[in-house]
Swiss-Prot record:
Its biological purpose: Binds 16S rRNA, required for the assembly of 30S particles and may also be responsible for determining the conformation of the 16S rRNA at the A site.
Designated name of the protein: Small ribosomal subunit protein uS14
Any single Gene Ontology cellular-component annotation: cytoplasm
GO molecular function, one term: structural constituent of ribosome
Organism: Vibrio cholerae serotype O1 (strain ATCC 39315 / El Tor Inaba N16961)
The protein's assembly and partners: Part of the 30S ribosomal subunit. Contacts proteins S3 and S10.
Length: 101
């Protein structure tokens, strides 16, 4: 199990990403715009750098909903591979069963 503080940190990051997503997108559009002046582009870079570090989407980490485990995360289920296997063996996931060939 992951520490509660790690889970809380990820939730905080998710809120920051949602809060600043539009602002980051507009600043990145200005930076990549070829027709914008150099001064406007430079000001956009400075404003982007002044935003909170955790507001970047790449800082987020997918975590298992039950355990908070950061590795082996399966997006389709929102669980780690270990919890998916346990649920599968108990028959809690419809249509999913152990492979055999």
């Amino acid at each position: 199990m992951a520490k509660q503080s790690m889970k809380a940190r990820e939730e905080k990051r998710a809120k920051l990403v949602a809060q600043f997503a539009e602002k980051r997108a507009t600043l990145k559009a200005i930076i990549s715009d070829v027709n914008a002046s150099e001064e406007d582009r430079w000001n956009a870079v400075l404003k982007l750098q002044s935003l909170p570090r955790d507001s970047s989407r790449s800082r987020q980490r997918n975590r298992c909903n039950q355990t908070g485990r950061p590795h082996g995360f399966l997006r389709k289920f929102g669980l780690s591979r270990i919890k998916v296997r346990e649920a599968c063996m108990k028959g809690e996931i419809p249509g999913l069963r152990k492979a055999s060939w």
